């Protein structure tokens, strides 16, 4: 069973006792439950299972309650948070201060105690502290006893939730660069600061010759290769298309067959480089079996490779 990051729901409230907080408890928790239901029923993880939500044990009106909520979320494996409120709250005491969790704040557009002021104040606090948050506010005014989520608000919540889950799943994993700068394209220069500071990822790099080494030394699962080659013979080689090269530049049938074998092996090897492969350990290749913990990778397609050997188009399409 995969362990995916959950979304934490933070119901914040005006912490003043004596009638203020008490009058808002039920409303605020109802909004939190509605958000959790919305996300779990519409957003899924990559394997198709619903995204799990964790709601704070109670409303958050003071910093001690913020801390208790953060502790619970750490235990539960939360990877992103959305703060929900129907009223003014004390922003610096109730805001999510975790620097690694993607954040959103929904301020309820209500008739009596609108969340607009808190939304503006807490978003300013997030910006000042360098902890970006996505602000959500409804177009239409709702009655205080209306706990429904308007369509425009729901769309914003779901857009944020999908992005937040993706970012949370990337954190702690690697981007694997196979090769160096691609074809002189500045956009292919890997910005390690972006990956580390914005996505919480690390960067790994191997030379393109590692693919050739693994081919030459047979560092791939032969049984898996046979299955992959049979699939390719059936579904890909039969759709090669027309040969548009000049006759003197055209490859022979034997050369084309060799290219197909090459790109299939290349695909398996790139996958092994990214995620590792326990089968390689059984074959005696303990280091290669580990992989680079990569959730994404790029074959940089340097001319020194692509003018000489098959490029990575097939690998990229399959992966």
Protein language model features and the residues they cover:
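An N-terminal assembly and electron-transfer interface module characteristic of large anaerobic redox
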Residues: 1-319
């Amino acid at each position: 069973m995969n362990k995916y990051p959950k979304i934490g729901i933070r119901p914040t409230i005006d912490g003043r006792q004596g009638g203020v907080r008490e009058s808002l408890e039920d409303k605020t928790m109802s909004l939190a439950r509605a958000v959790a239901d919305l996300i779990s029923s519409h957003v899924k993880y990559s394997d198709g299972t619903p995204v799990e939500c964790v709601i704070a044990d109670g409303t958050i009106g003071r910093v001690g309650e913020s801390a208790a909520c953060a502790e619970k979320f750490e235990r539960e494996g939360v990877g992103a948070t959305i703060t929900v409120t129907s009223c003014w709250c004390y922003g610096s005491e109730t805001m999510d201060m975790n620097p690694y969790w993607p954040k959103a704040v929904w301020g309820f557009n209500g008739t009596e105690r609108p969340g607009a002021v808190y939304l503006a104040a807490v978003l300013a606090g997030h910006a000042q502290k360098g902890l970006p948050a996505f602000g959500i506010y409804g177009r239409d005014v709702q009655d205080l006893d209306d706990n429904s989520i308007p369509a425009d608000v729901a769309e914003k919540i779901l857009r944020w939730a999908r992005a937040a889950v993706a970012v949370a799943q990337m954190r702690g994993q690697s981007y694997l660069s196979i090769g160096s700068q691609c074809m002189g394209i500045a956009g292919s220069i890997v910005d390690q600061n972006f990956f580390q500071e914005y996505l919480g990822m690390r960067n790994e790099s191997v030379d393109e010759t590692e693919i050739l080494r693994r081919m030459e030394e047979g560092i791939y699962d032969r049984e898996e290769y046979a299955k992959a080659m049979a699939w390719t013979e059936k579904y890909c080689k039969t759709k090669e298309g027309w040969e548009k090269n000049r006759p003197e530049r055209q490859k022979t049938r034997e050369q084309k067959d060799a290219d197909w074998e090459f790109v299939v092996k290349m695909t398996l090897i790139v996958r092994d480089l990214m995620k590792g492969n326990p089968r390689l350990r059984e074959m005696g290749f303990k280091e290669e079996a580990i992989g680079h913990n990569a959730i994404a990778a790029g074959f940089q397609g340097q001319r020194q490779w692509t003018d000489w050997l098959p490029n990575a188009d097939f690998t990229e399409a399959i992966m």
